[in-house]
Amino acid sequence: MHTYKFIQIALLFASVALAIPTPPSPPNPPPVPQLPNSETKSNRLVSHSCEFCGVVKPSGPAYLEHYHQNHREEVWGKLATPSPPNPPPVPTQKVETHAPKTHGCEWCNKVEPSGPAYIKHYKENHEDQVWGKWAGQDAKASP
């Protein structure tokens, strides 16, 4: 029985996970062109030319830095623009980690600091308003 329930729950989670659409991913940056070194005949990278503007950079990191500074927004569009920074937090005089829960009476709008104090206030002042005078007499008369 437990195995059956486990399988049902697993299938439920799998179906929910498949139903969640994934956001579109931005396009990948262009690949770093690999140019062989003509002097040593090795495959070591010597220079990289930008396919957008033709600028030649000496290394892959320099090419990627050039790409991000100059052409990223052209390729990625609005996805490349950074979101505006969050406003700085407003300083407060006092930071409370715990605020006590108060209980307000819906009949007289008196606020009691705790649940037992509210129940005591309710029984003393408003029980007759809700149930009428007969509520207390019936409670005493019943065995």
Curated annotation (Swiss-Prot):
Q: Zinc finger regions (C2H2-type), where?
A: 48-71, 103-126
- Annotated membrane-spanning segments are none
- The question of whether Oxidoreductase is a record keyword is answered with no
| Residue stretches of biased makeup (Pro residues) | 24-34, 82-91
The entry's cellular-component GO terms read: extracellular region; host cell nucleus
Classification via InterPro entries: Znf_C2H2_type
Q: What induces it?
A: Expressed during multiple stages of host plant infection, including the early biotrophy, late biotrophy and transition.
Keywords annotated in UniProt: Host nucleus, Metal-binding, Repeat, Secreted, Signal, Transcription, Transcription regulation, Virulence, Zinc, Zinc-finger
MF terms (GO), sorted A to Z? zinc ion binding
**Subcellular locations according to the entry:** Secreted; Host nucleus
State where it is primarily located. secreted
Location of the region described as Disordered in the Swiss-Prot/TrEMBL record? 24-43, 77-99
Q: Where is the signal peptide?
A: 1-19
Provide the function of this protein.
Probable secreted effector that translocates into the nuclei of host cells to reprogram the expression of targeted genes by binding on effector binding elements in rice.
* Name of this chain's protein: Host transcription reprogramming factor 8
Biological source species: Pyricularia oryzae (strain 70-15 / ATCC MYA-4617 / FGSC 8958) (Rice blast fungus)
Gene giving rise to this polypeptide = HTR8
